[in-house]
Amino acid sequence: MAKEDYYETLGVPRNASDSDIKKAFRRLAMKYHPDRNKDNPEAEERFKSVKEAYDVLSDPKKRSAYDQFGHAGIDPSMGGGGGFGFTGDSFSDIFGDVFGDIFGGGGRRRGRGQRGSDLRYNLELTLEEAVAGTEAKIKVPTWVTCTECGGSGAKKGSAPVTCPTCHGQGAVRMQQGFFSVQQTCPTCRGTGQHISDPCRVCYGQGRVQETKTLSVKIPPGVDTGDRIRLSGEGEAGEGGGPPGDLYVHIGVKQHPIFTRDGADLYCEVPIGFPTACLGGELEVPTLDGKVVLKIPAETQTGRLFRVRGKGVKPVRGGVAGDLLCRVRVETPVHLNKEQIDLIRQLDESLRGGGSHHSPQAHGWLDGVKQFFDRLGL
């Protein structure tokens, strides 16, 4: 199962306080603890995910790195991300070592071959790229399988052996007064295996940090919020485990002319005062050329004209949307004396027609007059 966002795993917002994060972890840890769900392997995996999320979000430095870079910003060798299971440290901090004895799970073996973390990459596209589709080159800082040891973590010619301290159990029991407490094995860190001669390149982790360059095919019609999954392109697993996935999250830049609403595109078209009065033709842009828009006489500001099929074809199939052009009548500026005189003559002529020439303006003025009459003004 693909790893969730750590905040989603704990069910808290990104601005959650340390106290809220701790409370969420306590609640979920009690709910999914393996010893309370012995016949439910999914609960154990869920518990590991909850613990891993808490390990990162409860540490200010790790949380800051995660907020900036996602899973790629967390160093798995420090306990956050990378599918390392759980170590039990923060668990003891919250519930106390007695909790491990009560449930018998305070140092459960993690095993080698842990799946790598999923990664998130935010890709910003132009509207043209999003509508037509494109191929993007991205650089992703991540963990890759160590080529020197092939992911085993052991030096060439050697292999991991059963841990001599815990005998492969991943945990040891310690006596604390009247209580017998189970803790993570300090030798193998819960894996149950010990590397006596670690790889000189990855120092026993089975993977190394590297920046990968990937080519991502973006299908036509994507929009902000869409997500593309690249299977196996996440972080390499620990100890030869399978890699995680890479999720490319799409964001579309603001366009200087068009705005998008689903499959439809919108634009604002300024028209001159004479064109609004008398009508005319106007060239308007589309994403694949231009079309001629016929403006009828007596067009008012805000009128919407629809150009069918000039919108966006949805990424999941279907017919293309439309281009909707909203006209805005532009008031003439920087008039000379002759033009001002002509406008005044036109105004006098129009006033003679009363509400016939300006029905909206006269209707509004009549409404205002009635409003004032009701107020006695």
Swiss-Prot record:
<dbReference type="InterPro" id="IPR012724">
    <property type="entry name" value="DnaJ"/>
</dbReference>
<feature type="repeat" description="CXXCXGXG motif">
    <location>
        <begin position="163"/>
        <end position="170"/>
    </location>
</feature>
<feature type="binding site">
    <location>
        <position position="202"/>
    </location>
    <ligand>
        <name>Zn(2+) 1</name>
    </ligand>
</feature>
<keyword id="KW-0479">Metal-binding</keyword>
<feature type="binding site">
    <location>
        <position position="188"/>
    </location>
    <ligand>
        <name>Zn(2+) 2</name>
    </ligand>
</feature>
<dbReference type="GO" id="GO:0051082">
    <property type="term" value="F:unfolded protein binding"/>
</dbReference>
<dbReference type="GO" id="GO:0005737">
    <property type="term" value="C:cytoplasm"/>
</dbReference>
<dbReference type="InterPro" id="IPR001623">
    <property type="entry name" value="DnaJ_domain"/>
</dbReference>
<feature type="repeat" description="CXXCXGXG motif">
    <location>
        <begin position="146"/>
        <end position="153"/>
    </location>
</feature>
<dbReference type="Pfam" id="PF00226">
    <property type="entry name" value="DnaJ"/>
</dbReference>
<feature type="binding site">
    <location>
        <position position="146"/>
    </location>
    <ligand>
        <name>Zn(2+) 1</name>
    </ligand>
</feature>
<feature type="binding site">
    <location>
        <position position="149"/>
    </location>
    <ligand>
        <name>Zn(2+) 1</name>
    </ligand>
</feature>
<feature type="binding site">
    <location>
        <position position="199"/>
    </location>
    <ligand>
        <name>Zn(2+) 1</name>
    </ligand>
</feature>
<comment type="subunit">
    <text>Homodimer.</text>
</comment>
<keyword id="KW-0677">Repeat</keyword>
<dbReference type="InterPro" id="IPR001305">
    <property type="entry name" value="HSP_DnaJ_Cys-rich_dom"/>
</dbReference>
<dbReference type="Pfam" id="PF01556">
    <property type="entry name" value="DnaJ_C"/>
</dbReference>
<dbReference type="InterPro" id="IPR018253">
    <property type="entry name" value="DnaJ_domain_CS"/>
</dbReference>
<dbReference type="GO" id="GO:0005524">
    <property type="term" value="F:ATP binding"/>
</dbReference>
<dbReference type="GO" id="GO:0031072">
    <property type="term" value="F:heat shock protein binding"/>
</dbReference>
<feature type="binding site">
    <location>
        <position position="166"/>
    </location>
    <ligand>
        <name>Zn(2+) 2</name>
    </ligand>
</feature>
<feature type="binding site">
    <location>
        <position position="185"/>
    </location>
    <ligand>
        <name>Zn(2+) 2</name>
    </ligand>
</feature>
<feature type="zinc finger region" description="CR-type">
    <location>
        <begin position="133"/>
        <end position="211"/>
    </location>
</feature>
<dbReference type="GO" id="GO:0051085">
    <property type="term" value="P:chaperone cofactor-dependent protein refolding"/>
</dbReference>
<feature type="repeat" description="CXXCXGXG motif">
    <location>
        <begin position="185"/>
        <end position="192"/>
    </location>
</feature>
<comment type="similarity">
    <text>Belongs to the DnaJ family.</text>
</comment>
<dbReference type="InterPro" id="IPR002939">
    <property type="entry name" value="DnaJ_C"/>
</dbReference>
<dbReference type="GO" id="GO:0042026">
    <property type="term" value="P:protein refolding"/>
</dbReference>
<keyword id="KW-0963">Cytoplasm</keyword>
<keyword id="KW-0346">Stress response</keyword>
<dbReference type="InterPro" id="IPR036869">
    <property type="entry name" value="J_dom_sf"/>
</dbReference>
<feature type="region of interest" description="Disordered">
    <location>
        <begin position="219"/>
        <end position="242"/>
    </location>
</feature>
<feature type="domain" description="J">
    <location>
        <begin position="5"/>
        <end position="70"/>
    </location>
</feature>
<dbReference type="GO" id="GO:0008270">
    <property type="term" value="F:zinc ion binding"/>
</dbReference>
<dbReference type="GO" id="GO:0006260">
    <property type="term" value="P:DNA replication"/>
</dbReference>
<keyword id="KW-0143">Chaperone</keyword>
<comment type="function">
    <text>Participates actively in the response to hyperosmotic and heat shock by preventing the aggregation of stress-denatured proteins and by disaggregating proteins, also in an autonomous, DnaK-independent fashion. Unfolded proteins bind initially to DnaJ; upon interaction with the DnaJ-bound protein, DnaK hydrolyzes its bound ATP, resulting in the formation of a stable complex. GrpE releases ADP from DnaK; ATP binding to DnaK triggers the release of the substrate protein, thus completing the reaction cycle.</text>
</comment>
<protein>
    <recommendedName>
        <fullName>Chaperone protein DnaJ</fullName>
    </recommendedName>
</protein>
<dbReference type="Pfam" id="PF00684">
    <property type="entry name" value="DnaJ_CXXCXGXG"/>
</dbReference>
<feature type="binding site">
    <location>
        <position position="163"/>
    </location>
    <ligand>
        <name>Zn(2+) 2</name>
    </ligand>
</feature>
<keyword id="KW-0235">DNA replication</keyword>
<dbReference type="GO" id="GO:0009408">
    <property type="term" value="P:response to heat"/>
</dbReference>
